Amino acid sequence: KTCASLTDTTTQLTALGFHLATLPVEPRIGKLIIYGALFLCVDPALTIAASMASKSPFLSPFDNREAANESRKAFSIDDSDHLTIVTAFKKWRELRIRKGDGAASRFARENFLSRIALFQIEELRKQFSSLLVEIGFLPAGFRLERAGETSDSNKNAKNISLLKAVLCA
């Protein structure tokens, strides 16, 4: 009921509950990726969902905690941990695509980001997008790698207020 998956008067599934029941993920993650698809902010929704299902990409080494915190603040958006992760992941991913793994590894090291966590997020994003295709929330043939911010599925990817609403729904 906390995910609005049951009706108030009966134990029948709502439309959302029906779709959540088909996904092999926690309901809160399923709800986030479905709403991300519905509200055309797939890319950030997938990143947030993937980060919720894995470890945080931010490292906080005991001997360099202050520098790590400063680095994290550089990625910060609207005091939101989730949106901060979206920004850090997006920069790492763009650098990896443009300049390769070596540059992305340096970026991760310099910014106190866990490469393992970033790769896990990347893999989970692919899995979650495939699930959305399977249940019809993304078109057949959807390719996450080609779905930039200008694609139909990401028309609202930069709308911070909408992203926060999707997170809180």
Give each language-model segment a name.
Residues 1-169:
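Second RecA-like catalytic domain
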